[in-house]
């Protein structure tokens, strides 16, 4: 009986240590990558478009390995090609054509997978794989199109980035420290209501701080936008957890230390 109790205590201690280490990795990742991203965002232009495209390519790579159980060329080739064309079209000031290219790449991937299905597929990635190209395309087009505004583009990118990062870090930290009722246990066994509220508070504080420092006077409106963005960030996190559960994966990727994708 004593050995059983000791092993349970040891397991809980190891879990807490692992959670603390994960939080440290998240903070370190943000501290290292954050300034780099913001410097490139401040510079803008082709360099920032390239950074966004590289990030979107990473998103597509991890998504494809998750939903197709491999680096499926039927998804990656048309997906990477669509991102490349979107990059060029954004750079020559054709955002509508860039967006259209993402959907063309998604449709092409679906057609290729329908025409050449795997004989014994472990999974059927047609819908999930083609939607992943749209998902990655949004990850590229969102920040790239925001930054095109020469007057407020950098502030907009800074607002979104800091709101999202603060939401993620505060939700994780507050949830781990306070615990409490789970937000949606069927989807995620770790996310709590306390963490969700903490994430919203942190996200709104970060977003309004950016606006205040940038001389924006409509702070109430900015706070509402930051609140909505924080909620959407956490909803996206829950969606990712649902996808991971759907495909039996613990993490969706490992490109950024401390983040499961």
Please place each PLM-identified region on the residue numbering.
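Membrane-embedded alpha-helical bundles of polytopic integral membrane proteins
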Residues: 2-228
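Interfacial loop-to-transmembrane junctions
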Residues: 246-261
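Re-entrant/interfacial helical elements at transmembrane boundaries that shape
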Residues: 176-177, 243-246
């Amino acid at each position: 009986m004593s050995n059983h109790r000791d092993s349970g205590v040891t397991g809980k201690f190891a879990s807490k240590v692992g959670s603390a280490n994960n939080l440290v990795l998240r903070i370190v990742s943000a501290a290292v990558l954050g300034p780099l991203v913001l410097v490139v965002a401040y510079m803008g232009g082709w360099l920032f478009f390239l950074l966004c495209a590289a990030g979107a390519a990473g998103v597509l790579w991890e998504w494809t390995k998750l939903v197709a159980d491999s680096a499926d060329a039927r998804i990656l080739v048309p997906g990477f090609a669509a991102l490349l064309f979107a990059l060029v079209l954004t750079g020559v000031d054709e955002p509508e054509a860039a967006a259209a290219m993402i959907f063309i790449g998604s449709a092409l991937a679906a057609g290729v997978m329908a025409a050449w299905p795997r004989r014994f597929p472990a999974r059927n990635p047609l819908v999930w794989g083609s939607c992943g190209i749209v998902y990655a395309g949004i990850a590229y087009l969102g920040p790239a199109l925001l930054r095109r505004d020469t007057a407020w583009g950098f502030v907009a990118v800074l607002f979104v980035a800091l709101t999202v990062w603060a939401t993620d870090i505060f939700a994780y930290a507050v949830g781990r420290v306070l615990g409490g009722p789970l937000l949606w246990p069927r989807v995620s066994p770790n996310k709590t209501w306390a963490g969700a509220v903490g994430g919203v508070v942190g996200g709104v504080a970060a977003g309004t701080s950016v606006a205040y420092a940038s001389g924006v006077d409509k702070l109430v409106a900015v706070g509402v936008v930051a609140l909505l963005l924080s909620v959407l960030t956490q909803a996206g996190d829950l969606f990712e957890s649902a996808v991971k559960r759907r495909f039996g994966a613990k993490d969706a990727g490992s490109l950024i230390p401390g983040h499961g994708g």
